[in-house]
Each structure stands twice: as C-alpha cells, then as structure tokens.
Amino acid sequence: MIMKSTLTFILGFFLVQFSFAADDETCAIMIGDEIDPEEFSEVAGKKVYFCCGSCVKAFDANTAYYIKALPSLAKKFSDAEKKKLGVDKVKLMEQRYCPIYPERVVNPNSKFEVYKGKKVYFWSSSAIRRWKRDPDKYHAEAVKRGHLKG
C-alpha cells in the first residue's frame, strides 16, 4: 500500500512538472525549434526559454514587441506586467515572419531590404543574401504562405 501511494505521488509530481514545462518546449521566436534550458531571458521575475543565443539577443532587444506579437509569450505575463513593460504602447508590424526562414519571427529592428517600395524584414544577413539572388521568387513564396502582402 505504501509502495503504491509513493509511486502515485512520484508519477503525479512528474506529470505536474511536465505540464509546467510543456509551454516552454519549443522556442517562441524560431517557431518549432526545441528550447535549450541554458538559453533564457528573465523578465518580470519569469524565465523565458529560447533555442539559442540569437533568440535571447533578439528578445532582450525587443521584449515588449515580442510579447505583444506572440501569444505564447503574452500569456506568460499579467496585464499589469505587460503594461509595466510597455507592451500596450507597441505598434505591431504587418510582417511577422522572415520570408527566407518562415519559422523565424522578425521585429522592427530586424535587418530589412526595400522591395517595390516596401520594407521587407529578415532574420539575418544570410537571409538577405539569399533574398537578393531572386527577390521575386522569394516574395511570391512568402505571399503564398501569407507572410507578406502581394
């Protein structure tokens, strides 16, 4: 009987721990990438985990923007915390994703190129180099995915 109760307690403990970790299993900025427990930022006393240092750096430089743009991050903070961080003052861009790396979320400080009179934001310099090889092709692909307007 004691053994059964102990096993039930241990199983319950791990299920609770797993349910808390479930939200942080994938990166919010590089959508779908597994988080690295050593790559995190602490905001309002909460640890926000990412897959790599590049995401930590992007988040730290644009914290309020990413919290407003990404529901997975917004739900981690109360309305009062978001207000204190300035999330309510953030104006979201039309574009959310890099046209070359569509699983990566861009921000107003991301590198950009002007394409047919409009700014197109990119995750990295390597994304811009690929874009420049055939901007019409990559633009069409991003429009088809709904990541850029036509």
Describe the predicted segments one by one.
Residues 19-150:
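Intrinsically disordered, low-complexity terminal tails/loops enriched in metal-binding residues
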Residues 5-17:
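Bacterial N-terminal signal peptides
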Residues 1-3:
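N-terminal secretory signal peptides that target proteins for export/translocation
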